[in-house]
């Protein structure tokens, strides 16, 4: 038979079968092609980059199928007619028949299912449809696989697998489509969860539905009524079970993690073939099941994972997950381990990888589309996200880098306004040449409307430092979230500037020569301006790119910016400057190198002192200047020698003083190490050797020198800044740095200018009278009334003082060897140090002309414990009560804050008897802090060395008053010299004599020179006359002043011992008094000498009756407002008016709040320490007055006393004025006491070297270094004076208490320690504030 005929016959048979099977359709191919359209869903699910590759084969396939259906290939008609061809055709037809038979069986199964559905719908039953899960509709599997590109024109079957495909299959190599891993989306996760619940529900309902269907069929066949009822009961039970299953919650239907589900059905039905069954199963069992923890891994959990994985050899991850016990799957454990494994960590891109990626992109890109998922197949160890990020952020040649142009910023702002601040992928297309990351960073970090640009203020810098300490360096986004109006890049840039500035400052300190360092206001201002320029420059240029290279370039550029000019704060004017030692050595020790006139004046005057009467610096004073100071004196050390010469008239004519008034600081050039290292500045022969030696030891001294300079800067800033408030004081020896006496500070020059300006006392009186609102007319009236009283009233007050004076003389005679006397040279040294203002008694000390006795050396005693302090306090209280009860009521005079001032006799040669008139003691009751006027007993200052005792720096806290003699030179501090004596006080016969002038008037006077001590209300001066005692030594005990205690009946006079510590000698049981010559006539001496500040217009008479010209009163002199402040006159006048000052409602006047000073702070602290005792005394007063019984300090007694005071003194103007003054003076100190600084301890600690934990690291190192220096300083002081108590005890001794003996004062007083620690804490507070700035 012809082959063509057979072929035609077979074709006809096939078409006939098709018509029989599908009478309503043209061909089977139509069904297949229609079902194949579902493949578009897969193409839709693919990513955009693969759409083109997936769409191209489909289009080609459709075109080929249409061409094959329309016309036949002409090559098919020319087949050879041989048996081989027939066999091949037979094989092809067999394959076609098999495929058609499979399709027919599927269609039959589908037809059968459709018939069942139709029958089920027609039956009308409400029971659920019973469906076999194994017989799924065939159309679900048709069309979900890509058809081959080429297929047979008749059968549509493609060619068999080629050799390459078969080889890959045998080797297990996956196809390219199988290598694609797409990320699971949120809707896919939700669909997976829903599919698992549906499959679980179907598995539970299937047996119940089959049972229900069986019961229905059986019920339809049963005829008896009983069987039908039993079946109905079973049907109801089955329906109830089905309802219970339908009501199960979703969590119960999810099942366990490893439960089996029909993953094939879920993959084909629910996911429509987009995900394979195996991929879905792995994702559900490894990540998505609810029992798997999806929280972030903690650090402890990761560490445990590493340890457990190491025990299992990094295998058996399911065992690792079980042992970990944190609901993690094995896949999660493996994935996290790979992330933290350094061997598997992704490394940086190499040049070869960049070159390969660039080449692949250029070859495989189609227009703007880049198939990253195909390119990653050729990049081993990289994923598609890495490729996208690397190409779009770094390798794309169209990207721009560097600064943004204004046009680009404008385009970026327009794009943000158009698309919003989120669609950066669209925004980048509006800004050509910039990536989405660049656009986002530029807008958020620079162009956002809420960002603040420009210089950082101090508050922002402080917040930045605190946030860096809180979160650490590197968390800039977190820091910027809490720092308003600043971005993370700004915070990073500012932190780099601060760190570089700190390192530069430390490096600058380390590289600076040892003696050429200069700390001045210009340095601080330049650093501040550099900070400003750096911050502004970095803010303008650092945000253009996220890389550190550009940021460093911008920081380097900001260094070259010119610092902008701005006003330097006033506090910077007080920054000390260091002096070049070699320059000071060439110009003379103790002089100022910038002004040689001063040096010449000082040296010449010291050499020709015996020839001229000018006020110059003696050799002893020069030696005093070279002694290392151990006290924090606010007097600048460079100008201490001028304290002896600033009250005389010659100083105004001296050209050196005139040059000091015009002194300006010049920048000092650092000298070579050779000129500084040598002992002799003029020795140039040893220059190279010294230079080499200096360079060899320079590196070893950097740290110590940096610490010393830093500490010295902070201390001088603090001490010099508080000079205008606290005046001229001595601070306790705590951490005094040692420096040469020739070092000059700017404060020295300012103080010299003030001292050369010879300020009179009248403006000071006028100032204080106006500040405290003193009634001058009333004071004058009281003065006149007191002067008119007879002198007989003095007798009752002197009866109690004579026995004490006799006892004092006897005790002093016995204890003469224990108290080494001081020469005039020592007195001059002590006068050069200002006494610390105290609210206590002022002590005078005798200065007989004896040879100084060196104090024994030894270790400092151990501080007392708390129990010892409490025991001493109880003893003092008991002694005070006994003394109060023993004393009688001898006078009704009210004396407050007694201070004993006694003049001594003229010194006589050692060993000669005391011949002269009988001595008498003068007792002056003055109310405020002591002053010191020291004079020399000899006519000239001795020139020569000083003893070992004199080399120890004195620490005087009190004032020694010596009578002036022939050749006497009076050295008074500038602060007290300005307060010259006013008429109406103790008759002195005129002002204090100046240096270089013989005070002939002072020789004729019998009373000592008493400096005025100001107070708000008039005080009384009581003179007690002592009969002559022969054989009495010159050093005697002082008379005890009368202190008055208010009781319910009258005033009690109590003897208060004046206890003052001597730093260089051992204390006697009571203080040493000074004796003066007897008054010429008791009748000529007034009984009571008034000493009010306002009584300056009276005309006092001298002891010989001569008239003294009166001084104009304060009301006649103009008020010098420059004494208060350097601000404008209008501001000072407004403050003096007290518009916002202290005000007590009954009074109509206001009083301005006074600035805090050391005096007010100490007074407030003393009041707070004695607060409990004062409350008890006030309570006892109120209780005794109310009930007349024993005082009962119980609850309510204090309130009763307050009500009593309010009721009795409600309209008393004196009480109201006192209350107003109290508020004016102590309001600001009390307010400061309520504001403890940050990180500074407010309690007193016995360890003076402990520093707060929040101090910076540099200050901590400085504290450790200074601790050793402090111990050395303390050891030196203990060796000089092992038993020298602090004079702070002078105003803290209870009434009636005896003075402590030398044995009792062996250990330092706790109050003294607390006082010194108070000063130390104040210093540390100010220093910590400066360091934070």
Swiss-Prot record:
Any one GO MF annotation of this record: DNA binding
Region Disordered: list its residue ranges.
29-84, 503-558, 662-702, 811-842, 1079-1117, 1282-1333
What coarse category fits the chief subcellular location reported for this protein?
nucleus
Q: Where is the composition biased (Low complexity)?
A: 516-546
Where does the record place Acidic residues bias?
Answer: 41-52, 59-73
Q: Which UniProt keywords apply?
A: DNA-binding, Nucleus, Phosphoprotein, Repeat, Transcription, Transcription regulation
Q: Which residues, renumbered to this chain, carry the PTM Phosphoserine?
A: 68, 1252, 1254, 1301, 1309
| Region named SNAPC5-binding | 84-133
Bias category Polar residues: which stretches?
A: 672-686, 811-826
**GO BP field:** snRNA transcription by RNA polymerase II; snRNA transcription by RNA polymerase III
- Description of how the protein assembles with itself and partners: Part of the SNAPc composed of 5 subunits: SNAPC1, SNAPC2, SNAPC3, SNAPC4 and SNAPC5. SNAPC4 interacts with SNAPC1, SNAPC2, SNAPC5, BRF2 and TBP.
* Family matches, as PANTHER family: SNRNA-ACTIVATING PROTEIN COMPLEX SUBUNIT 4
Q: Which named protein is this? A: snRNA-activating protein complex subunit 4
Q: Which residues form a coiled coil?
A: none
Which residues lie in Basic residues bias regions? Answer: 503-515, 1324-1333
GO cellular component terms, A-Z: nucleus; snRNA-activating protein complex
* Annotated region of DNA binding: 317-341, 424-447, 476-499
| UniProt key word tRNA processing | no
Q: Where is it localised?
A: Nucleus
Where does the record place the region SNAPC2-binding?
Answer: 1131-1247
Q: Known Gene3D superfamilies for this protein?
A: Homeodomain-like
Q: Which organism is it from?
A: Mus musculus
What is the stated purpose of this protein? Part of the SNAPc complex required for the transcription of both RNA polymerase II and III small-nuclear RNA genes. Binds to the proximal sequence element (PSE), a non-TATA-box basal promoter element common to these 2 types of genes. Recruits TBP and BRF2 to the U6 snRNA TATA box.
- The Myb-like domain is annotated at 250-288, 344-395
